[in-house]
Amino acid sequence: MEAVWESARILANSRFAVAFTGAGISAESGIPTFRGKDGLWSRFDPRDLATPEAFNRDPRLVWEWYSWRIERVLAAKPNKAHRLLARLEDSGVLKAVITQNVDGLHRRAGSRRVLELHGNVLRARCTRCGSKLEWREKPSNLPPSCPRCGGVLRPDVVWFGEPLDTSLLEEAFGLARRSDVMIIIGTSGAVDPAGLLPLAAKESGATLINVNPEPNRYSGVADIELRMRAVEFAERLSRAMGIDI
């Protein structure tokens, strides 16, 4: 496909390429979407679970849902698209990955500079002392308590109605404005302020490579449109660039 070869050429000649990823890059790793069809949780709207109000009302119910999600994330493995971005960073082409995902698969694939705008489901944060811990297995006693102070732990993610970390968001916009190429993979771009990052990159002169099987917010704005899934893109681009994934 000519557009893939053109993407390879643009990336090879780039000075500061950045990736921006969403749920589509992890779907092929088996990460369930918010509105999964798995038994109990199909009856719940995520907005009734992923909010501070829901946690204050019924922390055990919220943790039961997150325990289910943690179990599936721990069982998942990075796919070729995650590994492609890690290899591009290894080669010096890619400078950072900015992700809306909370599954930690970019780091597990080997990416080092990863900005997790919405947090990480494998981390918990104490509501009392603020200390953090990482899950190696799903929590058993729900809601879990802080090993330091005994306070109630909450998932270290951004819930509906909560602001993103200001310093992290500023860093992400700084990277976007500095980039000369941005690869957008697997996101509709519907959720702001994260969805504004590719537009900020474009306004600063970056070339946008938009990888998504369906039209999205960046269709018509991007310089290169690749209507394909993340893994197919990774396979094609890695061949074009001679990268082993």
From Swiss-Prot:
Record's cofactor remark: Binds 1 zinc ion per subunit.
Presence of keyword Lipid metabolism: no
Chief location category: cytoplasm
Record CDD domains: SIRT5_Af1_CobB (cd01412)
E.C. code: 2.3.1.286
Binding site for substrate: 66, 69
Keywords of this entry: Cytoplasm, Metal-binding, NAD, Transcription, Transcription regulation, Transferase, Zinc
Domain Deacetylase sirtuin-type: 1-245
Residues annotated as binding NAD(+): 22-41, 100-103, 186-188, 212-214, 241
Record field: catalytic activity: N(6)-acetyl-L-lysyl-[protein] + NAD(+) + H2O = 2''-O-acetyl-ADP-D-ribose + nicotinamide + L-lysyl-[protein]; N(6)-succinyl-L-lysyl-[protein] + NAD(+) + H2O = 2''-O-succinyl-ADP-D-ribose + nicotinamide + L-lysyl-[protein]
Catalytic residues as annotated in Swiss-Prot or TrEMBL: 118
GO molecular function, one term: protein-malonyllysine demalonylase activity
First-level EC class: transferase
Function field: NAD-dependent lysine deacetylase and desuccinylase that specifically removes acetyl and succinyl groups on target proteins. Modulates the activities of several proteins which are inactive in their acylated form. Deacetylates the N-terminal lysine residue of Alba, the major archaeal chromatin protein and that, in turn, increases Alba's DNA binding affinity, thereby repressing transcription.
Protein name: NAD-dependent protein deacylase
